[in-house]
């Protein structure tokens, strides 16, 4: 999924060069608009000192997509039409909520892998 915001590792490289007297990566950079970026762009940005990447759009989509899939697959059970009661198993939030949580969890795992943070800790 591509968003309207694109990362520009070249800009990050130029910013990092401004502080070369302070070391190779003189600034901790935040990657705003990281959702939809290519893995190569993410990795290149990390090499220039990015320590945080915002993926709000990706995580919102990862949470919402399974809910919509569930609603479409269980359309007749989710809706109460013309006085019918529907199917409680279809519209119970515990059913579609688990799917949403699993979608979010999978996206967070992917983000950790993309950002090279899997298996690391801040408190070494």
Feature names for model-found ranges:
Residues 72-124:
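Extended, intrinsically disordered, low-complexity segments
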Residues 67-71:
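Short low-complexity, flexible loop/linker segments enriched in glycine and/or proline
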Residues 48-66:
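Glycine-rich phosphate-binding active-site loops on the catalytic face of alpha/beta enzymes
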Residues 8-12, 42, 108-112:
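Generic structural signal for well-ordered alpha-helices
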Residues 1-29:
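Alpha-helix-loop-beta-strand connector modules within alpha/beta enzyme cores
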Residues 33-37, 57-60:
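Glycine-rich beta-alpha junction loops
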Residues 27-33, 51-55:
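Hydrophobic faces of well-ordered beta-strands that scaffold small-molecule active sites
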Residues 34-48:
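Catalytic cores of alpha/beta
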């Amino acid at each position: 999924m591509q968003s309207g915001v694109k990362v520009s590792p070249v800009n990050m490289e130029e910013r990092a060069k401004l502080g070369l007297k302070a070391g190779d990566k003189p600034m901790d950079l935040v990657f705003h608009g990281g959702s939809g970026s290519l893995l190569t762009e993410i990795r290149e940005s990390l090499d220039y000192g990015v320590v945080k990447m915002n993926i709000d759009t990706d995580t919102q989509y990862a949470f919402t997509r399974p809910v919509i899939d569930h609603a479409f697959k269980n359309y007749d059970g989710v809706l109460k039409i013309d006085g019918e009661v529907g199917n409680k198993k279809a519209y119970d939030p515990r059913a579609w909520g688990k799917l949403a949580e699993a979608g979010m969890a999978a996206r967070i795992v992917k983000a950790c892998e993309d950002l090279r943070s899997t298996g690391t800790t801040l408190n070494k």
